[in-house]
């Protein structure tokens, strides 16, 4: 069962991840440190060298935003977590109001739990095996936390229009 998803919120959350990344990796914030730790030097590279990673980031950010909206919808929208509903309950699902505070709180908590259990855990595992500097791992994991928190806030303040 697919819960109601506010695709405008998903698009806004996707764009928010791009803004967070642009600020985080700017030279005045963490960009210089990140370039030093990774050895990446963007100067002199063709434009396509940045376009492809940005397009990939946009796509996976959309997937992440949609996935969080789906999880939060399954948890908070009445009826979406119980597939054995009868017809009357299904109808009630579509007219039942969404508790906006619960939706927001669930979005934030779910985002942080999913970040810790999937994003941070996987980053740390891969970086440990690849021998990446701990400072780089921390920089990237904290960036992902900030990104997920902002994304979760956007999803959380803009629930589906079932209310």
Predicted region positions:
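Juxtamembrane/disordered regions of integral membrane proteins
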Residues: 1-163
């Amino acid at each position: 069962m697919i819960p109601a998803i506010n695709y405008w919120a998903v698009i806004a959350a996707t764009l928010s991840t791009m803004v967070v990344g642009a600020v985080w990796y700017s030279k005045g914030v963490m960009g210089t440190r990140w370039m030093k730790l990774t050895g990446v030097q963007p100067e002199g590279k063709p434009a396509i060298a940045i376009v492809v990673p940005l397009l990939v980031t946009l796509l996976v950010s959309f997937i992440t935003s949609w996935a969080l909206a789906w999880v939060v919808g399954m948890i908070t929208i009445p009826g979406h977590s119980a597939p054995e509903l009868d017809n009357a309950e299904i109808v009630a699902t579509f007219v039942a109001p969404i508790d906006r505070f619960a939706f927001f709180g669930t979005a934030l908590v779910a985002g942080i739990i999913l970040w810790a259990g999937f994003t941070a855990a996987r980053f740390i595992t891969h970086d440990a095996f690849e021998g990446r500097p701990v400072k780089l791992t921390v920089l990237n994991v904290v960036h992902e936390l900030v990104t997920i928190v902002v994304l979760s806030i956007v999803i959380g303040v803009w629930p589906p229009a079932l209310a």
